[in-house]
Amino acid sequence: MNIKENDLPGIGKKFEIETRSHEKMTIIIHDDGRREIYRFNDRDPDELLSNISLDDSEARQIAAILGGMVYKPQALESIEMAFSDLIIEWFKVEKGAKSIGRTLGELDVRQNYDVTVIAIIKHNQEKLLNPGADSIIEENDTLVLSGERKHLKKLIHDFLSGEGV
């Protein structure tokens, strides 16, 4: 699958997606939380086949279904309450970040920040699920992180953003 990400200043982000079977869609995530999904004709990319608009809550529920979670509204609500402080965040390693060229073991994010690195999506789209301590972080890698928001923010500031330099 090929995904192109573009900033839309004043609007949000646009993701252009082409699946392995060459089907194309565009997802726009607005700064206010709304999502729009557009599905295009594979033979004529200018022909819109369908579109749908979702609010933030609807998009998250659909993401849970697509992500393979068993969808039961009552169970989902109790999970959200039990893990209200636990979040999963995707963060692209910025130019100049202190983590570039270092291994996960060197950073010891679990011990030092109480954060778990679930996956690393390398800049060439290679996916490392449950990466080991010897996994090297490179500029433009996307890290999938799990932890409390305050711990994630500190890790991102200290090692993943260009701000920590």
Curated annotation (Swiss-Prot):
Description of activity control:
Binds cyclic di-AMP (c-di-AMP), which may regulate the activity.
Q: Does the keyword Ligase apply?
A: no
Enumerate the subcellular locations listed in this protein's record, separating them with semicolons.
Cell membrane
Report the GO molecular function annotations: monoatomic cation transmembrane transporter activity
Which membrane topology term applies here? Peripheral membrane protein
The entry's function note states:
Required for activity of the potassium/proton antiporter KhtU. Involved in protection of the cell from methylglyoxal, a toxic by-product of glycolysis.
Q: What's the name of the protein?
A: K(+)/H(+) antiporter subunit KhtT
The species is Bacillus subtilis (strain 168)
